[in-house]
């Protein structure tokens, strides 16, 4: 076998479905205005960074993380209003938590279901675990198709249903009555993904202990800590105990825990940043809607989805901001329902004005 080339060895060793995948694309952002990843555009104030530096200096790196961090759990409960009776599990962002949920719940061939299009990692994580992913198409207006979703639940009996509240990339926040109908119909677990909850002003967290088949999943990525990779899952302690069984040992490094603890002592700073982005979302949406041939979809997130139906399609329009080193996310080829759609994160007022100017110039040329 020593003379066998690497590609042949890979074909023998790596799963065929993995070889067929492409790695998650991350654009080169050097020197660019980043409006493509729903990050907070504001850096933390100096006093917060000083506390982070102090916490890092005082954190020993020669020992593995403790199995639990009761002090940080207490901080997270207080900062994010997690019910005292709920179980709480930390993960490296929502991505790891999605993996843990599917690994714990699904045997090969079991079904994971979500309205679609939604967060792409629901699909990817299911496939990586040999589960079957069922995406229930949204309506032509990118709203939840509740009858179709309930019919799919009845037909496929999913072990796990993922609901992004609000949804990414559409921005739609589905009504409580629709979520309630899905909770009542689902035979397994319903994961309420509240990654963008700080911008929606709505949450299921206070009610999570009343829902025997639901958990709330969140991340700190969208509120100014995307570089930290920290997510948390809250729900009935019995659910959390099962997911904890498949959690890798020492999954949360000590620096991430120390940094989060330091930042949460300044929680009003994060809240103010979220409030600012929520306030700036509507002017960005209004500016996009004023452009010729543009349809803007309502958003409860820190981003706006717009469809470009004029003389230029979404692929062509996408190039205009890029030539000015402004990154936005092109969904034109991601799903038929997203044809000619760009998703634009809410940035600073200056950044929002820059992307609107670039789009105005190309659409008016």
Curated annotation (Swiss-Prot):
InterPro entries: Aminotransferase_I/II_large (IPR004839), HisP_aminotrans (IPR005861), PyrdxlP-dep_Trfase (IPR015424), PyrdxlP-dep_Trfase_major (IPR015421), PyrdxlP-dep_Trfase_small (IPR015422). Keywords: Amino-acid biosynthesis, Aminotransferase, Histidine biosynthesis, Pyridoxal phosphate, Transferase. One of its GO terms (biological process) is L-histidine biosynthetic process. GO terms for molecular function: histidinol-phosphate transaminase activity; pyridoxal phosphate binding. It catalyses: L-histidinol phosphate + 2-oxoglutarate = 3-(imidazol-4-yl)-2-oxopropyl phosphate + L-glutamate. Its cofactor is pyridoxal 5'-phosphate. Its EC number is 2.6.1.9. It is an enzyme of class 2 (transferase). CDD domains: AAT_like (cd00609). The modification N6-(pyridoxal phosphate)lysine is found at residue 222. Pathway: Amino-acid biosynthesis; L-histidine biosynthesis; L-histidine from 5-phospho-alpha-D-ribose 1-diphosphate: step 7/9. Homodimer. Belongs to the class-II pyridoxal-phosphate-dependent aminotransferase family. Histidinol-phosphate aminotransferase subfamily. NCBIfam families: hisC. HAMAP family: HisC_aminotrans_2 (MF_01023). This is Histidinol-phosphate aminotransferase 2.
